[in-house]
Amino acid sequence: MGETIRFGISIDDKLLESFDQLIEHKGYANRSEALRDLIRASLIDVKWENGEEEMVGTVTLVFNHHVRDLSDKLTEHQHAYHHQIISALHVHLDAHNCLEVLVVRGKAREIKKIADELIGVKGVKHGKLVMTATGHDLH
């Protein structure tokens, strides 16, 4: 971690008031912590948009396991991308529905492609990709 530097910013009073409400709602200790998180989030977004950066994340899927061949298709996808899908969690939500959470790692564009393919499999009721940085470049 580098040296901490103090700096000042000019901000509209109403915007600052809204920011302070957000800080309180999220439970930040102070404005500095909240601002650091916002900067990190922006940097991660840029890496995600670039497509070439190494990212990690999760693909969450909800599906009815009674749909013909669906479980097999999802498993085939996982095996096809075994280098990028580094872990899987399967939960039986009820007698029909399952939740699958896949931990993924790789270039952002590759991860997005994998997620789109999995979410697009016929029978998947809902799917979502959540990406973040590997932590190497975050300070």
Swiss-Prot record:
Pfam families: NikR_C, RHH_1
Cofactor entry: Ni(2+)
The keyword Methyltransferase belongs to this UniProt entry's keyword annotation: no
Cofactor note: Binds 1 nickel ion per subunit.
Signal peptide: none
Any GO BP annotation: response to nickel cation
Residues the entry annotates as binding Ni(2+): H79, H90, H92, C98
Superkingdom of the organism of origin: Bacteria
Key words of the record: DNA-binding, Metal-binding, Nickel, Transcription, Transcription regulation
MF terms in GO: DNA binding; DNA-binding transcription factor activity; nickel cation binding
InterPro entries tied to this protein: Acetolactate_synth/TF_NikR_C, ACT-like_dom_sf, Arc_rbn_hlx_hlx, CopG, CopG/NikR_regulator, Ni_resp_reg_NikR, Ribbon_hlx_hlx, TF_NikR_Ni-bd_C
SUPFAM superfamilies named among the record's database cross-references: ACT-like (SSF55021), Ribbon-helix-helix (SSF47598)
Family named by the database record: Belongs to the transcriptional regulatory CopG/NikR family.
Functional description taken from the UniProt entry: Transcriptional regulator.
Protein's name in the database: Putative nickel-responsive regulator
Top-level taxonomy: Bacteria, Pseudomonadati, Thermodesulfobacteriota, Desulfuromonadia, Desulfuromonadales
